[in-house]
Protein backbone atom coordinates (compact mmCIF):
# COMPACT_ATOMS: atom_id res chain seq x y z
CA UNK A 1 0.00 0.00 0.00
CA UNK A 2 3.02 2.27 0.52
CA UNK A 3 4.65 1.38 -2.77
CA UNK A 4 3.17 4.26 -4.77
CA UNK A 5 4.45 7.07 -2.49
CA UNK A 6 7.87 5.46 -2.34
CA UNK A 7 7.94 5.22 -6.09
CA UNK A 8 7.00 8.87 -6.56
CA UNK A 9 9.64 9.86 -4.02
CA UNK A 10 12.24 7.84 -5.86
CA UNK A 11 11.24 9.38 -9.19
CA UNK A 12 11.64 12.87 -7.72
CA UNK A 13 14.99 11.98 -6.20
CA UNK A 14 16.31 10.60 -9.47
CA UNK A 15 14.92 13.54 -11.43
CA UNK A 16 16.57 16.06 -9.12
CA UNK A 17 19.94 14.42 -8.52
CA UNK A 18 20.33 11.40 -10.78
CA UNK A 19 21.28 9.32 -7.72
CA UNK A 20 19.52 6.08 -6.90
CA UNK A 21 17.42 5.80 -3.78
CA UNK A 22 19.62 3.05 -2.33
CA UNK A 23 22.81 5.09 -2.57
CA UNK A 24 21.05 8.12 -1.08
CA UNK A 25 19.81 6.12 1.89
CA UNK A 26 23.29 4.74 2.56
CA UNK A 27 24.79 8.23 2.30
CA UNK A 28 22.19 9.75 4.64
CA UNK A 29 22.79 6.96 7.12
CA UNK A 30 26.50 7.88 7.28
CA UNK A 31 25.82 11.57 7.97
CA UNK A 32 25.85 12.84 11.58
CA UNK A 33 22.43 13.43 13.10
CA UNK A 34 23.06 17.15 13.58
CA UNK A 35 24.01 17.58 9.92
CA UNK A 36 20.93 15.69 8.72
CA UNK A 37 18.68 17.69 11.08
CA UNK A 38 20.19 20.94 9.79
CA UNK A 39 19.68 19.87 6.18
CA UNK A 40 16.04 18.99 6.83
CA UNK A 41 15.43 22.28 8.66
CA UNK A 42 16.96 24.28 5.80
CA UNK A 43 15.00 22.42 3.12
CA UNK A 44 11.69 22.73 4.97
CA UNK A 45 12.36 26.44 5.59
CA UNK A 46 13.15 26.90 1.90
CA UNK A 47 9.87 25.21 0.97
CA UNK A 48 7.90 27.41 3.37
CA UNK A 49 9.52 30.66 2.22
CA UNK A 50 9.12 29.83 -1.47
CA UNK A 51 5.50 28.69 -1.19
CA UNK A 52 4.30 31.54 1.03
CA UNK A 53 6.18 34.16 -1.01
CA UNK A 54 4.65 32.84 -4.22
CA UNK A 55 1.11 33.16 -2.82
CA UNK A 56 1.60 36.75 -1.66
CA UNK A 57 3.35 37.75 -4.90
CA UNK A 58 0.60 36.21 -7.04
CA UNK A 59 -2.02 38.03 -4.98
CA UNK A 60 -0.18 41.28 -5.71
CA UNK A 61 -0.02 40.59 -9.44
CA UNK A 62 -3.63 39.42 -9.70
CA UNK A 63 -5.47 41.84 -7.44
CA UNK A 64 -3.30 44.79 -6.48
CA UNK A 65 -5.06 48.21 -6.37
CA UNK A 66 -1.78 49.84 -7.41
CA UNK A 67 -1.45 47.67 -10.53
CA UNK A 68 -5.12 47.31 -11.51
CA UNK A 69 -4.18 44.53 -13.93
CA UNK A 70 -7.21 42.40 -14.84
CA UNK A 71 -5.43 39.75 -16.94
CA UNK A 72 -5.19 36.57 -14.82
CA UNK A 73 -4.70 34.34 -17.88
CA UNK A 74 -1.75 36.44 -19.07
CA UNK A 75 -0.15 36.32 -15.61
CA UNK A 76 -0.46 32.53 -15.63
CA UNK A 77 0.80 32.33 -19.23
CA UNK A 78 3.89 34.39 -18.40
CA UNK A 79 4.72 32.18 -15.42
CA UNK A 80 4.49 29.08 -17.64
CA UNK A 81 6.71 30.80 -20.22
CA UNK A 82 9.37 31.57 -17.60
CA UNK A 83 9.28 27.98 -16.35
CA UNK A 84 9.65 26.61 -19.91
CA UNK A 85 12.61 28.89 -20.63
CA UNK A 86 14.27 27.99 -17.33
CA UNK A 87 13.91 24.26 -18.03
CA UNK A 88 15.38 24.65 -21.51
CA UNK A 89 18.16 26.90 -20.22
CA UNK A 90 19.18 24.45 -17.51
CA UNK A 91 19.06 21.60 -20.01
CA UNK A 92 21.38 23.49 -22.37
CA UNK A 93 23.72 24.36 -19.51
CA UNK A 94 23.81 20.72 -18.39
CA UNK A 95 24.73 19.67 -21.93
CA UNK A 96 27.49 22.28 -22.22
CA UNK A 97 28.81 21.86 -18.66
CA UNK A 98 27.97 18.31 -17.49
CA UNK A 99 29.79 18.68 -14.19
CA UNK A 100 28.13 21.95 -13.25
CA UNK A 101 24.42 21.18 -13.59
CA UNK A 102 22.60 17.85 -13.41
CA UNK A 103 19.51 18.24 -15.59
CA UNK A 104 17.89 15.99 -18.23
CA UNK A 105 18.24 16.78 -21.92
CA UNK A 106 15.12 18.52 -23.23
CA UNK A 107 14.25 18.48 -26.92
CA UNK A 108 10.71 19.34 -27.95
CA UNK A 109 9.12 16.24 -29.49
CA UNK A 110 5.65 16.88 -30.92
CA UNK A 111 4.67 13.24 -30.45
CA UNK A 112 5.51 13.41 -26.75
CA UNK A 113 3.78 16.79 -26.48
CA UNK A 114 0.59 15.22 -27.87
CA UNK A 115 0.88 12.35 -25.38
CA UNK A 116 1.16 14.83 -22.51
CA UNK A 117 -1.63 17.09 -23.85
CA UNK A 118 -4.54 15.55 -21.84
CA UNK A 119 -2.58 16.05 -18.63
CA UNK A 120 -1.62 19.56 -19.77
CA UNK A 121 -5.31 20.47 -20.06
CA UNK A 122 -5.80 19.42 -16.43
CA UNK A 123 -2.59 21.26 -15.50
CA UNK A 124 -3.90 24.43 -17.17
CA UNK A 125 -7.15 24.13 -15.24
CA UNK A 126 -5.23 23.62 -12.00
CA UNK A 127 -2.99 26.69 -12.26
CA UNK A 128 -5.67 28.90 -13.85
CA UNK A 129 -8.40 28.14 -11.31
CA UNK A 130 -5.81 28.44 -8.56
CA UNK A 131 -4.86 31.96 -9.65
CA UNK A 132 -8.49 32.94 -10.23
CA UNK A 133 -9.36 31.76 -6.71
CA UNK A 134 -6.51 33.86 -5.32
CA UNK A 135 -7.68 36.84 -7.36
CA UNK A 136 -11.19 36.84 -5.89
CA UNK A 137 -10.61 35.67 -2.30
CA UNK A 138 -8.31 37.04 0.36
CA UNK A 139 -5.08 35.26 1.26
CA UNK A 140 -6.42 34.45 4.78
CA UNK A 141 -9.35 32.48 3.27
CA UNK A 142 -7.28 31.02 0.43
CA UNK A 143 -6.40 27.75 2.19
CA UNK A 144 -10.00 27.11 3.23
CA UNK A 145 -11.22 27.92 -0.29
CA UNK A 146 -8.88 25.27 -1.71
CA UNK A 147 -9.26 22.77 1.12
CA UNK A 148 -11.25 20.09 -0.72
CA UNK A 149 -8.25 18.55 -2.52
CA UNK A 150 -8.08 15.66 -0.03
CA UNK A 151 -11.81 15.03 -0.39
CA UNK A 152 -11.53 14.94 -4.18
CA UNK A 153 -8.52 12.61 -3.88
CA UNK A 154 -10.68 10.11 -2.00
CA UNK A 155 -13.68 10.52 -4.33
CA UNK A 156 -11.73 10.30 -7.60
CA UNK A 157 -9.60 7.40 -6.35
CA UNK A 158 -12.84 5.47 -5.92
CA UNK A 159 -14.52 6.60 -9.15
CA UNK A 160 -11.50 6.36 -11.47
CA UNK A 161 -9.14 3.90 -9.78
CA UNK A 162 -11.68 1.82 -7.80
CA UNK A 163 -9.61 2.33 -4.64
CA UNK A 164 -11.57 2.23 -1.40
CA UNK A 165 -10.94 4.36 1.68
CA UNK A 166 -11.12 3.37 5.35
CA UNK A 167 -13.77 4.63 7.73
CA UNK A 168 -11.28 6.70 9.75
CA UNK A 169 -9.97 8.42 6.62
CA UNK A 170 -13.56 9.22 5.64
CA UNK A 171 -14.10 10.78 9.08
CA UNK A 172 -11.17 13.13 8.51
CA UNK A 173 -12.68 14.12 5.16
CA UNK A 174 -15.92 14.91 6.99
CA UNK A 175 -14.00 17.25 9.30
CA UNK A 176 -12.45 19.00 6.27
CA UNK A 177 -15.85 19.45 4.61
CA UNK A 178 -17.28 20.79 7.88
CA UNK A 179 -14.44 23.30 8.15
CA UNK A 180 -14.95 24.34 4.53
CA UNK A 181 -18.67 25.06 5.02
CA UNK A 182 -18.06 26.83 8.34
CA UNK A 183 -15.43 29.00 6.63
CA UNK A 184 -17.90 29.96 3.90
CA UNK A 185 -20.51 30.78 6.53
CA UNK A 186 -18.11 33.00 8.47
CA UNK A 187 -16.84 34.78 5.35
CA UNK A 188 -20.48 35.49 4.48
CA UNK A 189 -21.19 36.75 7.99
CA UNK A 190 -18.25 39.16 7.73
CA UNK A 191 -19.35 40.33 4.28
CA UNK A 192 -16.11 39.20 2.61
CA UNK A 193 -17.36 36.04 0.89
CA UNK A 194 -16.65 35.78 -2.83
CA UNK A 195 -18.83 33.05 -4.31
CA UNK A 196 -16.91 33.28 -7.58
CA UNK A 197 -13.58 32.84 -5.82
CA UNK A 198 -14.93 29.93 -3.78
CA UNK A 199 -16.16 28.14 -6.92
CA UNK A 200 -12.75 28.65 -8.54
CA UNK A 201 -11.17 27.23 -5.38
CA UNK A 202 -13.31 24.09 -5.58
CA UNK A 203 -12.45 23.68 -9.28
CA UNK A 204 -8.76 24.16 -8.48
CA UNK A 205 -8.97 21.43 -5.82
CA UNK A 206 -10.64 19.10 -8.33
CA UNK A 207 -7.91 19.75 -10.92
CA UNK A 208 -5.15 19.18 -8.35
CA UNK A 209 -6.59 15.73 -7.64
CA UNK A 210 -7.00 14.92 -11.34
CA UNK A 211 -3.45 16.13 -11.99
CA UNK A 212 -2.05 13.74 -9.37
CA UNK A 213 -3.94 10.79 -10.86
CA UNK A 214 -3.10 11.43 -14.51
CA UNK A 215 0.53 12.30 -13.82
CA UNK A 216 1.17 8.63 -13.01
CA UNK A 217 -0.24 7.61 -16.39
CA UNK A 218 1.75 10.17 -18.39
CA UNK A 219 5.16 9.75 -16.70
CA UNK A 220 6.20 6.79 -18.94
CA UNK A 221 5.85 9.06 -22.00
CA UNK A 222 8.58 11.34 -20.59
CA UNK A 223 10.85 8.53 -19.33
CA UNK A 224 9.59 9.06 -15.77
CA UNK A 225 11.35 12.43 -15.63
CA UNK A 226 9.58 15.07 -13.54
CA UNK A 227 11.54 17.83 -15.28
CA UNK A 228 10.59 16.63 -18.77
CA UNK A 229 6.97 16.49 -17.68
CA UNK A 230 7.26 20.02 -16.26
CA UNK A 231 8.76 21.24 -19.53
CA UNK A 232 6.09 19.70 -21.78
CA UNK A 233 3.24 20.75 -19.48
CA UNK A 234 4.36 24.37 -19.51
CA UNK A 235 5.07 24.45 -23.26
CA UNK A 236 1.61 23.03 -23.99
CA UNK A 237 0.10 25.52 -21.55
CA UNK A 238 1.80 28.45 -23.30
CA UNK A 239 0.37 27.37 -26.65
CA UNK A 240 -3.15 26.81 -25.30
CA UNK A 241 -3.20 30.06 -23.31
CA UNK A 242 -2.67 32.22 -26.42
CA UNK A 243 -6.15 31.71 -27.96
CA UNK A 244 -7.70 32.03 -24.49
CA UNK A 245 -6.11 35.45 -24.01
CA UNK A 246 -7.39 36.57 -27.42
CA UNK A 247 -10.94 35.30 -26.85
CA UNK A 248 -11.17 36.83 -23.36
CA UNK A 249 -9.81 40.17 -24.56
CA UNK A 250 -6.79 40.13 -22.29
CA UNK A 251 -4.40 41.23 -25.05
CA UNK A 252 -6.39 44.44 -25.50
CA UNK A 253 -6.43 44.99 -21.74
CA UNK A 254 -2.69 44.40 -21.62
CA UNK A 255 -1.99 46.95 -24.37
CA UNK A 256 -4.02 49.52 -22.42
CA UNK A 257 -2.21 48.70 -19.15
CA UNK A 258 -0.52 51.83 -17.76
CA UNK A 259 2.44 49.96 -16.22
CA UNK A 260 3.25 47.89 -19.31
CA UNK A 261 6.63 49.60 -19.76
CA UNK A 262 7.45 49.54 -16.04
CA UNK A 263 10.62 47.62 -15.14
CA UNK A 264 9.20 46.96 -11.66
CA UNK A 265 6.12 45.27 -13.14
CA UNK A 266 8.14 42.94 -15.35
CA UNK A 267 10.51 42.21 -12.47
CA UNK A 268 7.57 41.12 -10.32
CA UNK A 269 6.14 39.07 -13.18
CA UNK A 270 9.47 37.33 -13.76
CA UNK A 271 9.92 36.77 -10.04
CA UNK A 272 6.49 35.11 -9.99
CA UNK A 273 7.64 32.79 -12.78
CA UNK A 274 10.83 31.99 -10.87
CA UNK A 275 8.82 31.10 -7.78
CA UNK A 276 6.55 28.93 -9.93
CA UNK A 277 9.59 27.03 -11.18
CA UNK A 278 11.23 26.90 -7.75
CA UNK A 279 8.21 25.46 -5.95
CA UNK A 280 8.47 22.26 -8.00
CA UNK A 281 12.16 21.97 -7.16
CA UNK A 282 11.86 22.64 -3.42
CA UNK A 283 8.88 20.28 -3.19
CA UNK A 284 11.07 17.53 -4.61
CA UNK A 285 13.88 18.50 -2.24
CA UNK A 286 11.58 18.32 0.77
CA UNK A 287 10.36 14.85 -0.21
CA UNK A 288 13.96 13.81 -0.90
CA UNK A 289 15.25 14.82 2.54
CA UNK A 290 12.14 13.76 4.49
CA UNK A 291 9.34 11.62 3.02
CA UNK A 292 6.06 12.10 1.12
CA UNK A 293 4.20 11.80 4.44
CA UNK A 294 6.35 14.43 6.16
CA UNK A 295 5.96 16.66 3.12
CA UNK A 296 2.18 16.60 3.56
CA UNK A 297 2.50 17.46 7.25
CA UNK A 298 4.89 20.29 6.42
CA UNK A 299 2.45 21.60 3.82
CA UNK A 300 -0.36 21.65 6.38
CA UNK A 301 1.79 23.49 8.93
CA UNK A 302 2.86 25.93 6.22
CA UNK A 303 -0.77 26.64 5.39
CA UNK A 304 -1.42 27.46 9.05
CA UNK A 305 1.54 29.85 9.19
CA UNK A 306 0.48 31.43 5.90
CA UNK A 307 -3.02 32.12 7.23
CA UNK A 308 -1.70 33.77 10.39
CA UNK A 309 0.78 35.88 8.39
CA UNK A 310 -1.96 36.96 5.98
CA UNK A 311 -4.28 38.06 8.79
CA UNK A 312 -1.45 40.06 10.38
CA UNK A 313 -0.23 41.54 7.08
CA UNK A 314 -3.67 42.69 5.92
CA UNK A 315 -4.58 43.76 9.49
CA UNK A 316 -7.83 41.79 9.52
CA UNK A 317 -9.85 40.83 12.58
CA UNK A 318 -11.41 37.37 12.43
CA UNK A 319 -14.05 35.76 14.63
CA UNK A 320 -13.57 32.70 16.80
CA UNK A 321 -15.67 30.56 14.44
CA UNK A 322 -13.60 31.74 11.46
CA UNK A 323 -10.44 30.50 13.16
CA UNK A 324 -12.30 27.32 14.10
CA UNK A 325 -13.03 26.65 10.41
CA UNK A 326 -9.32 26.96 9.61
CA UNK A 327 -8.39 24.65 12.47
CA UNK A 328 -10.96 22.09 11.27
CA UNK A 329 -9.54 22.16 7.74
CA UNK A 330 -5.92 21.96 8.88
CA UNK A 331 -6.69 19.42 11.61
CA UNK A 332 -8.69 17.23 9.22
CA UNK A 333 -5.90 17.35 6.63
CA UNK A 334 -3.27 16.46 9.24
CA UNK A 335 -5.44 13.65 10.59
CA UNK A 336 -5.96 12.25 7.08
CA UNK A 337 -2.19 12.27 6.49
CA UNK A 338 -1.61 10.51 9.80
CA UNK A 339 -4.34 7.91 9.18
CA UNK A 340 -3.05 7.09 5.69
CA UNK A 341 0.51 6.82 6.98
CA UNK A 342 -0.59 4.55 9.81
CA UNK A 343 -2.54 2.35 7.37
CA UNK A 344 0.42 2.07 5.01
CA UNK A 345 2.75 1.15 7.85
CA UNK A 346 0.27 -1.40 9.16
CA UNK A 347 -0.11 -2.99 5.73
CA UNK A 348 3.67 -3.13 5.29
CA UNK A 349 4.16 -4.80 8.65
CA UNK A 350 1.17 -7.17 8.28
CA UNK A 351 0.23 -7.89 4.63
CA UNK A 352 -2.63 -10.13 5.80
CA UNK A 353 -4.36 -7.08 7.27
CA UNK A 354 -5.20 -6.02 3.74
CA UNK A 355 -7.82 -8.76 3.61
CA UNK A 356 -9.23 -7.63 6.94
CA UNK A 357 -9.62 -4.09 5.66
CA UNK A 358 -12.24 -5.26 3.19
CA UNK A 359 -14.70 -5.80 6.03
CA UNK A 360 -14.31 -2.17 7.19
CA UNK A 361 -16.76 0.56 6.20
CA UNK A 362 -15.82 1.81 2.75
CA UNK A 363 -16.66 4.76 0.51
Curated annotation (Swiss-Prot):
Q: Which GO terms describe its biological process?
A: 'de novo' GDP-L-fucose biosynthetic process; GDP-fucose import into Golgi lumen; GDP-L-fucose salvage; lipid glycosylation; negative regulation of Notch signaling pathway
Q: Which UniProt keywords apply?
A: Golgi apparatus, Membrane, Sugar transport, Transmembrane, Transmembrane helix, Transport
Pfam families, sorted: TPT
Q: Answer whether the UniProt record assigns the keyword Transport to this protein.
A: yes
Gene Ontology molecular function terms on file: GDP-fucose transmembrane transporter activity
Q: Name one GO cellular component term.
A: Golgi membrane
Broad class of where this protein is predominantly found:
Golgi
Q: Which domain of life is it from?
A: Eukaryota
Catalytic activity, as annotated: GMP(out) + GDP-beta-L-fucose(in) = GMP(in) + GDP-beta-L-fucose(out)
* UniProt subcellular location: Golgi apparatus membrane
* Membrane topology of the entry: Multi-pass membrane protein
**Keyword Transmembrane set for record:** yes
What parts of the sequence cross the membrane? 33-55, 75-97, 110-129, 139-161, 166-184, 194-213, 226-248, 263-285
The entry assigns this protein to a family as follows: Belongs to the TPT transporter family. SLC35C subfamily.
Q: What does this protein do?
A: Antiporter specific for GDP-l-fucose and depending on the concomitant reverse transport of GMP. Involved in GDP-fucose import from the cytoplasm into the Golgi lumen.
Protein name in UniProt: GDP-fucose transporter 1
Question: Which organism is this protein's natural source?
Answer: Mus musculus (Mouse)
Q: Gene of origin?
A: Slc35c1
